Structures are given as C-alpha cells and as structure tokens.
C-alpha cells in the first residue's frame, strides 16, 4: 500500500502512510498481547508481565521460518480450532446445559430489579470483596466507590433496559466509533494488503466478503452465548475484568471448570498467534520494502530483503514484548485505552457501557454431580 502511495503522491505522503502503518501494527499487536496476558494470568496465575513477554515467541518461531505461506496455513488451521470452540460454547449454553428460554428468563429477571432491590439483595457490607478471579479489598479490586459494582437492573440507554434490544445508545455510539476508527486502521494495516496481493485477483474480493461473514460469526456467537450467559448467571466479574476481556474465561470456567479454561486458552492462543503472525509479516514487509529497499539499499537483492525480513520479525516480537510490559508497568490505563476499541475480541464481552457489575454475586449455581470433562466429552 505504501509503495502505491509513493508512486502516486511522492515521498512525503509515503513517509506519512508508513508512520501510520507502523502505528496500526503496534496498536493491534499491543491489544493482542495485553488482552492475552490478562486472560492467561486470570486462568493460570502466570505473571502478567511474563505472559506478555513470552506470547510473542510463539509467533516469532514459525513466522520467521515460514513467512507469509506459514501465516496463511496457520491461520486456516487456527480458524478451524476457534470455530470448534465457539460451537462447543454455543451448544453448551443454549442446548446442553441451558436453553434460549432459560437464558431469556434469567436476563428478564436481572433487568427487572430496581436499584434498591439490587442493593438489598447483593449488599456485601462488612464482607470480603471477591470477584470471579480475585479476592481482596475494594481498593485492591479497583472498586473506586464504597458500593461494589454489580450486574443487576435495567441497562441505561437500552430500550426498556433490555440486554437483547438493538435499540441501544451505547451500542450505536460504539458502532459509529468502531466503523470510523477501524476503517482507518484496516486501510493502513499492511497485513490486509498482503493477503489481497497474494490471492488470485478473481478470488480476492470473494475471499474478503466470505472472510468478513465468517469473522462476524465469532463475535456474534460469543457475545450471545458467553456474554449473555455471564449476565444471566450474574457471575462476579468486575467492570475492570469485563473490560479486560475476562467474561468468556469466567463463563467457560463456571460451566466446564478446568476443561472450559483449557478451551478458552486454546482459542485465545490460536487467535493471538494467527493475528500476531500477520502483523509481524506486515511490519517486516514495511521495513524491508518501504524502508530498507527504498531508502537504504535500492539495489537490494531478494536474498538481502529476505534476511532483513526475518531479522525484523524477531526484533519486532522482542520489541512488542518489552513494549507491552513497559506499558503494563508504567500505566495501567493503557490497557483500558487499548481494550476500549474492542478490537481484540469484541465478542468476548458485551459492550462496556452495558455493564454494571457487582463483585460478589453468586445467584445461580450449576449442579456439580457431573464433572466438567465428562460433560465436554459427552457433548463431543
């Protein structure tokens, strides 16, 4: 894309688009690492900084060796695994354990409570604050007010306070921001251009249309299964945890125990490695062709460009690991800023404006007579 810009508008425009291209790749990779590290820490207890630094190595190893071909092959395989996990979760929520009627009834009961009823039912005064993943004082859990956050009562800005309406003020605003903001991000993201150029011309347009339809199934299915199940079951997931994308692991762990945690980790790793590989290839392409060959060595051979690409993949992975750790250490708000784009996994949680979460709610319980692994094997 940057080469097209240089040929049409010259050096100044080329450098401008090159800068925004790098920014887009860094932002997307940051969201992958920060969201992935938060989930890994919540489910396994691995140190957040360590997880953020180690995750890129799964991308570096095969991307630097296989290049764009390895990225395409791995993405296809990873997508199959992701869809398998999504189908399992939807089947569990709406067929195996609950039904659409039950989930609807639970949600209707949740939004029927008034604020006074919610406070009376879910008051935790004088008790230890506990969320789904953590326990501690209100300050330690990030609860800024004396009253814990809770998922109870009607949703402000939604028609009739429902979680199931399309008439949502917050949802409309999110849609506008997402379309406007992510359109620019996609336009300057080299990974999309590489996929289009690598495909046959007659297959590129059809491929992107079908790919968009297939992608839509993932956030839509996760939001309407794990997202709504979290609200229906009133799981003790705090607002900050929901914003960090921890709703799916909470629901999966609640329904399947360790088996659910393993499935979410597998799905998460597949998504991170697949997208991270594409972003790494995009950065290496920008550096090799738009920086090295354009401004440093115009007479570069194919072998030299390949060597530069592989070096950049390794260096970019190391840089992003350190970048994620530094932001996590230096400013916890960066995670919230990044995740508010809902770009990592918009289906992993409902929109943040719909959450009013309590940190200590356990209303509905699942009968524990059948182990989670037996339930999963029976489903399969």
Regions found by a protein language model. Give the residues of each.
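Membrane-embedded helix-loop-helix hairpins and adjacent transmembrane boundary segments
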Residues: 1-380
């Amino acid at each position: 894309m940057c080469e097209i810009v240089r040929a049409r508008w010259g050096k100044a425009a080329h450098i401008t688009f090159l800068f925004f291209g790098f920014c887009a790749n860094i932002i997307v990779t940051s969201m992958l690492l920060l969201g992935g590290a938060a989930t890994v820490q919540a489910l396994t207890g691995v140190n957040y900084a360590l997880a953020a630094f180690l995750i890129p190595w799964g991308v570096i190893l095969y991307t630097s060796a296989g290049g764009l071909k390895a990225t395409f092959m791995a993405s296809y395989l990873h997508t199959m695994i992701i869809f398998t996990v999504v189908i399992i979760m939807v089947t569990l929520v709406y067929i195996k354990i609950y039904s659409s009627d039950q989930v609807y009834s639970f949600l209707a009961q949740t939004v029927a409570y008034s604020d006074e009823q919610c406070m009376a039912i879910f008051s935790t005064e004088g008790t230890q604050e506990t969320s789904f993943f953590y326990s501690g004082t209100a300050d330690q859990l990030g609860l800024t007010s004396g009253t814990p956050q809770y998922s109870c009562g009607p949703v402000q800005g939604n028609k009739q306070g429902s979680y199931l309406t399309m008439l949502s003020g917050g949802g409309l605003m999110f849609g506008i921001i997402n379309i406007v903001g992510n359109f620019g991000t996609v336009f300057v993201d080299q990974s999309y251009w590489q996929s289009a150029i690598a495909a046959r011309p007659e297959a590129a347009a059809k491929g992107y249309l079908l790919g968009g339809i297939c992608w839509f199934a993932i956030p839509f299915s996760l939001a309407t299964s794990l997202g709504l199940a979290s609200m229906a079951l009133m799981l003790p997931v705090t607002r900050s945890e929901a914003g960090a994308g921890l709703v799916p692991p909470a629901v999966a762990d609640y329904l399947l125990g360790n088996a659910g945690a393993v499935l979410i980790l597998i799905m998460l790793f597949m998504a991170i490695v697949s997208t991270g590989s594409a972003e790494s290839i995009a950065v290496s392409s920008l550096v090799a062709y738009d920086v090295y060959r354009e401004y440093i060595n115009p007479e570069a051979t194919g072998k030299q460009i390949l060597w530069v690409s592989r070096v950049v993949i390794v260096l970019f992975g190391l840089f992003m690991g350190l970048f994620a750790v530094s932001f996590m250490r230096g400013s916890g708000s960066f995670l919230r800023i990044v995740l508010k784009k809902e770009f990592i996994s918009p289906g992993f949680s409902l929109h943040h404006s719909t959450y009013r979460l309590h940190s200590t709610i356990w209303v509905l319980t699942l009968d524990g007579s059948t182990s989670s692994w037996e339930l999963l094997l029976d489903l399969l």
